[in-house]
């Protein structure tokens, strides 16, 4: 007879947000890109955790903080299959269904080094386009279009 030992690899939180099923190697980037660390609340990160769905995944838990639907939808660009769960008293009280936003403002950096958004005191602004499973972003200022991964790695 075989026994299975199930153990949480990342400690449960009493109240807050759990972002699960983030593609492996993306969790850290999401933390900085979306300024999820701009809090004094405890943040627990699991990187390269085993996942039945995708082999490996990242996980982020932020205590006493709830993401808005807009914030959660911005994550969909880089973690389309992620789940964003609201936790209260150690229970999932709400699951946010992610959908791509039409725009993303003041989060990403334009990869075009000649774009005025680098030198002027303006917030970045991108229109999100999805076609045949490919996601691209069009900068409001230089009007150039980029693959979403190019924008992810632009710093």
UniProtKB/Swiss-Prot annotation:
Alphabetized GO MF terms: metal ion binding
Presence of the UniProt keyword Metal-binding in the record: yes
Keywords: Metal-binding, Pyrimidine biosynthesis, Zinc
Coiled-coil segments on the chain, per record: none
Source species: Yersinia pseudotuberculosis serotype O:3 (strain YPIII)
Binding residues for Zn(2+): 110, 115, 139, 142
Any GO CC annotation of this UniProt entry: aspartate carbamoyltransferase complex
Known role: Involved in allosteric regulation of aspartate carbamoyltransferase.
GO biological process: 'de novo' pyrimidine nucleobase biosynthetic process; pyrimidine nucleotide biosynthetic process
Protein name as catalogued: Aspartate carbamoyltransferase regulatory chain
Lineage of origin: Bacteria, Pseudomonadati, Pseudomonadota, Gammaproteobacteria, Enterobacterales
Gene3D superfamilies cross-referenced by the UniProt entry: Aspartate carbamoyltransferase regulatory subunit, C-terminal domain, Aspartate carbamoyltransferase regulatory subunit, N-terminal domain
Pfam families: PyrI, PyrI_C
UniProt keyword Metal-binding, yes or no: yes
Classification via PANTHER family: ASPARTATE CARBAMOYLTRANSFERASE REGULATORY CHAIN
Gene responsible for this protein: pyrI
Cofactor note: Binds 1 zinc ion per subunit.
Subunit structure: Contains catalytic and regulatory chains.
UniProt cofactor(s): Zn(2+)
Family designation: Belongs to the PyrI family.
């Amino acid at each position: 007879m075989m026994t299975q030992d199930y153990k949480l690899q990342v400690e449960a939180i009493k109240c807050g947000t759990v972002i699960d099923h983030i593609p492996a190697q993306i969790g850290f980037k999401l933390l900085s890109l979306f300024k999820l660390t701009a809090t004094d609340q405890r943040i627990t990160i699991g990187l390269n955790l085993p996942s039945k769905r995708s082999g490996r995944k990242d996980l982020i838990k932020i205590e006493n903080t709830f993401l808005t639907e807009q914030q959660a939808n911005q994550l969909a660009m880089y973690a389309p299959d992620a789940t964003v769960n609201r936790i209260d008293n150690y229970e999932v009280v709400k699951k946010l269904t992610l959908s791509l936003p039409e725009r993303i403002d003041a989060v990403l950096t334009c990869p075009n080094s000649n774009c005025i958004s680098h030198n002027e005191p303006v917030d970045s602004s991108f229109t999100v386009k999805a076609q045949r499973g490919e996601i691209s972003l069009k900068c409001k200022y230089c009007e150039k279009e980029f693959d979403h991964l190019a924008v992810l790695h632009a710093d």
